[in-house]
Structure formats: C-alpha cells, structure tokens
Amino acid sequence: MSMFKEFRDFAMRGNVVDLAVGVIIGAAFGKIVSSLVANIIMPPLGLLIGGVDFKQFSWILKPADGAAPAVVMEYGVFLQTVFDFVIVAFAIFMAIKLMNRLYTKKEVEKPVAKPSAEETLLSEIRDLLKEQNGKAQ
C-alpha cells in the first residue's frame, strides 16, 4: 500500500499536474493549428500554385503490381506537416514572448548612496593636500 501512496503523492504534486494540463492543452492546440493549416492556409496556397491540393503531391517509387500495392512517397502530406510545425512553433514562440513580457520585472534603479562621513572627511583631506602641494610648487 505504501507504493500506491508514494505514486499518488508523486502524481498529485504541482509539477506533474501542471505538465499533464500543459500536454492536454498542447494536444488540443495542435489540432486547432492542424485544422488552420489544412483548411484555411493550404487551399489558397494550392490555388496560387494552380489549384493543386498539397496532399496530392507524391512520387510513385514502384507502381502497383498485382496484389502488391504501389510504393508512394507522399511529400505533399510531409509539406503540410512542416507547415503545421512552423505555425505551432511560431504560435508557441509568440505566447512565450508575451508571457516573458508580462512577467519580466523591470529593474528598479537603486538610488545613489551618499558617501559616508569617513569618505567625505577623506575627500576633504585629499583636496586640502592637493591645494597645499599646488601652492608649494
């Protein structure tokens, strides 16, 4: 029973719960971005290059032969996945940049400390010695 208690304590610590929430939200955010890329960005981009759907871009490495299916390299799907990644990475970058801006504490300028009584006295003695040396020459 103690192993179960240890596991429960571990799982309920703040960091683990925060991480789990972050992963779940990240997965949902990834789906939103994938939909944005597939349904909003890629169709106009395909239209600009001649009305082609990126998912259709592929190279047939070996045609189908009887019962053996064709060997196809679908680089269009890969390109769409790369666009997904770039947009997700940019969105995360912007979110972190915003969070850093919100949480960055501006350094408060420290007031210049007044010299202590000893320092003031030593400065006066130094100045007097300079005056005396200047008059003696």
UniProtKB/Swiss-Prot annotation:
Cell compartments where the protein resides: Cell inner membrane
A GO term for molecular function: mechanosensitive monoatomic ion channel activity
Pfam families membership: MscL
Single GO cellular component term: plasma membrane
Main location: membrane
Gene3D superfamilies from the UniProt entry: Large-conductance mechanosensitive channel, MscL, domain 1
PROSITE patterns given in the database record: MSCL (PS01327)
InterPro entries recorded: Mechanosensitive_channel_CS, MS_channel, MSC/AndL, MscL_channel
TM stretches of this protein: 10-30, 76-96
UniProt keyword annotations, A-Z: Cell inner membrane, Cell membrane, Ion channel, Ion transport, Membrane, Transmembrane, Transmembrane helix, Transport
Topology relative to the membrane: Multi-pass membrane protein
Description of how the protein assembles with itself and partners: Homopentamer.
Job description of the protein: Channel that opens in response to stretch forces in the membrane lipid bilayer. May participate in the regulation of osmotic pressure changes within the cell.
NCBIfam families in UniProt: mscL, PRK00567.1-1, PRK00567.1-4
Family indicated by similarity: Belongs to the MscL family.
PANTHER family, per database record: LARGE-CONDUCTANCE MECHANOSENSITIVE CHANNEL, MECHANOSENSITIVE CHANNEL MSCL
Protein name (record): Large-conductance mechanosensitive channel
Organism per entry: Erwinia tasmaniensis (strain DSM 17950 / CFBP 7177 / CIP 109463 / NCPPB 4357 / Et1/99)
